[in-house]
A protein has these predicted regions:
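Short amphipathic alpha-helices in soluble, non-transmembrane regions
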Residues: 245, 353-361
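An extended, acidic, His-containing surface patch that forms the Zn2+-binding/catalytic region
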Residues: 76, 92, 204-205, 264-327, ...
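Acidic/His- and Gly-rich active-site-bordering loop/insert found
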Residues: 8, 23-133, 152-161, 340
Length: 471
C-alpha cells in the first residue's frame, strides 16, 4: 500500500511538471516560485519525517522549468539531494565565484496553521504577495539565481571567470549532509573562490529607532554555534518526603545564574563600523555619543545590551530552548536537563563558553554535554576588498537611497562549511524586512512581495555581470 501511494505521488508530480514544462515561456517567474513553494522540502532532526520523493520531484521540477541552465551549465547532484551548477568562464586564470543557497525549509508548526492567512505550502499569489514557507528563507534565493542564469543564457552571456551555484538540502539542520559534502567535493577539485555569497545579511527598515532609510546589512562574519545539554542527576523518591533540592531545583538555580551572569559584551570591528556608518542618521544625542565612542563606550554598550536585538551583536548569547525532567506527579525526578543553544561571538570559543558555564554555575552536580555538530565563529571578511565593493555597488545601483553597513550575523549559514575555500565570504539577500515582517522568517505568514522578488532576480543578474566585468 505504501509503495502504491508513493507511485501515485510520483505520477501526480510528473503530470504537474509536464504541464509546467509544456509552456515554459508562458509560465512567469512568479508562478515558477509559487510552484516551487508547494514542494514540502522540510528539514527536521527527526529523520523519519524526511520524504525523499518530494526532494527528487523538486530537483526534477528545476530541470524542467530552467531548461537552458540545465543544458549549458554542468549540473551535478551531491549526496543525492544537494545541487551544484558549474558555469564555465572564458578566462581560466581568474578565480571563480560561488553563490550559495538552500532549498530545504523549516516546518510550519501544526498548532499555528490556523493563524496563516494562506496555507504555508500553497504558494498562494495575490495582487501584492507570494505566500509560503521558503519565500524568504531560502527557496526564493535558489529560484532567483536560476532565473538570473536562465535570463543571461538566453542573452548568450558567458562570464569571464567560472561561476558556481551550490544549493544545499539540509541547511536548516546544520548542512552536514548537504553543504559539508559539497565543500568536500570542491576540495577534491582544488577550488578556491575569489568570492562566496550566501544568505545571512538582509535589508531592514524602521528597525533602528530614528533611522527612516532602509539599511542593507552585509554580514562579513557570522557567529559560531553549539548546543549543550546541561543536566543534573539526583536521588529519586516519593514527593511526600522531599530533599532540600531536587534535580529540577538544582538545574533551575544553574539556569538563573547563567541569566544573571551573561558572557561579557564587547564591540567587534564589524559592529564598530556599523555604528560609525549609522551615527550620522541618528538623533543629536545618539549621534554625538557614537561619534565620541571611546568617551561614551560603557554607556553605548549598556544601551545596546539592554535591547534584545542589538544585545546579540555584542556578546555570546546562551538561550534555554528545551527542558526535560520528571515523569510522574508524585515522584521525585532523578534527572533534569535543559538544552542551551549558544551563539558564539568572535573572540570567544567553544572552550571558553564551556569554561564560563562551569564557572558561573559552580556546582559539581551540574554536568555539560556537547550535542551534535558545533562550530567556532567565522573569520571576518574585510569591508574594503573587491568582493565587498562589487556587492555594495550592485546594491547601491538598485537601491540608490540605501545605507550599506557590515554586520556580524547572529545566526549560522551553510557558508561556515566553505570557510577554507575563500577569504572573501559575504552574506546578503536582497529582501527588506521591518519589525513586523522579520517575525515571519521561520514564523507565521512568511511571504515576499511580487515587486521585491522580481527585483531580486534583476539584482542577481546584474551582480553576475558585475562580477564578470570587475573581478
Amino acid at each position: 500500500m505504501q509503495q502504491l501511494k508513493t507511485n501515485l505521488f510520483l505520477l501526480k508530480g510528473v503530470l504537474l511538471l509536464s504541464i509546467a514544462a509544456a509552456q515554459p515561456e508562458r509560465t512567469s517567474e512568479i508562478q515558477r516560485l509559487s510552484k516551487a513553494l508547494q514542494f514540502e522540502t522540510i528539514s527536521d532532526y527527526d529523520s523519519s519525517t524526511f520524504n525523499p520523493v518530494v526532494y527528487k520531484n523538486f530537483i526534477y521540477y528545476l530541470q524542467q522549468v530552467f531548461p537552458l541552465t540545465h543544458q549549458k551549465l554542468e549540473f551535478r547532484i551531491i549526496n543525492e539531494y544537494s545541487l551544484v551548477y558549474y558555469w564555465k568562464g572564458t578566462d581560466a586564470k581568474r578565480a571563480p565565484a560561488l553563490f550559495l543557497g538552500h532549498y530545504d525549509v523549516v516546518p510550519a508548526e501544526a498548532s499555528t496553521l490556523k493563524q496563516w492567512s494562506h496555507p504555508p505550502f500553497s504558494g498562494y499569489i495575490d495582487n501584492e504577495w507570494i505566500w509560503g514557507r521558503g519565500t524568504i528563507d531560502n527557496k526564493f534565493l535558489v529560484m532567483a539565481l536560476l532565473e538570473s542564469a536562465e535570463k543571461l543564457l538566453k542573452e548568450n552571456f558567458t562570464p569571464r571567470q567560472d561561476i558556481y551555484f551550490a544549493f544545499g538540502h539540509d541547511e536548516e539542520i546544520g548542512g552536514e549532509q548537504g553543504a559539508l559534502k559539497v565543500a568536500e567535493y570542491f576540495k577534491t577539485k582544488n577550488l578556491e573562490f575569489d568570492m562566496i555569497l550566501d544568505e545571512g545579511g538582509i535589508m531592514v527598515k524602521d528597525v533602528f529607532p530614528g533611522i527612516t532609510k532602509t539599511i542593507a546589512l552585509i554580514a562579513t562574519a557570522e557567529k559560531g554555534d553549539m548546543n549543550i545539554e546541561m543536566s543534573v542527576f539526583e536521588k529519586g523518591g516519593h514527593s511526600s518526603v522531599p530533599p532540600k533540592e531536587t534535580s529540577i531545583d538544582v538545574l533551575s538555580k544553574a539556569i538563573l545564574k547563567l541569566n544573571k551572569h551573561p558572557m561579557p559584551a564587547r564591540l567587534q570591528q564589524p559592529t564598530i563600523e556599523m555604528l560609525n556608518i549609522l551615527a550620522p542618521h541618528f538623533d543629536g544625542k545618539t549621534r554625538f555619543a557614537l561619534r565620541h565612542r571611546r568617551l561614551f563606550r560603557k554607556k553605548i554598550i549598556k544601551k545596546l545590551t539592554d535591547n534584545q536585538g542589538t544585545n546579540a551583536l555584542l556578546r555570546t548569547v546562551i538561550s534555554t530552548t528545551m527542558l526535560r525532567g520528571g515523569s510522574k506527579e508524585n515522584s521525585l525526578p532523578t534527572f533534569a536537563a535543559v538544552n542551551l543553544n549558544v551563539r558564539i561571538l568572535q573572540g570567544d570559543s567553544i572552550e571558553s563558553v564551556m569554561q564560563h558555564i562551569y564557572k558561573i554555575t559552580n556546582d559539581p552536580r551540574v554536568q555539560l554535554t556537547l550535542k551534535r555538530s558545533y562550530h567556532n565563529p567565522s573569520s571576518i571578511t574585510l569591508s574594503n576588498g573587491k568582493a565587498w565593493q562589487v556587492l555594495s555597488n550592485t546594491i547601491k545601483e538598485n537601491w540608490p537611497d540605501i545605507i550599506i553597513s557590515p554586520l556580524v550575523a547572529p545566526g549560522t549559514t551553510d557558508s561556515r562549511h566553505y570557510s577554507s575555500l575563500s577569504k572573501n565570504i559575504l552574506r546578503f539577500i536582497p529582501v527588506t524586512v521591518d519589525n513586523e515582517s522579520k517575525e515571519q522568517i521561520h514564523g507565521i505568514n512568511e511571504r515576499i512581495s511580487i515587486i521585491e522578488y522580481r527585483k531580486s532576480i534583476l539584482f542577481y543578474t546584474e551582480l553576475i555581470k558585475k562580477i564578470s566585468a570587475e573581478f
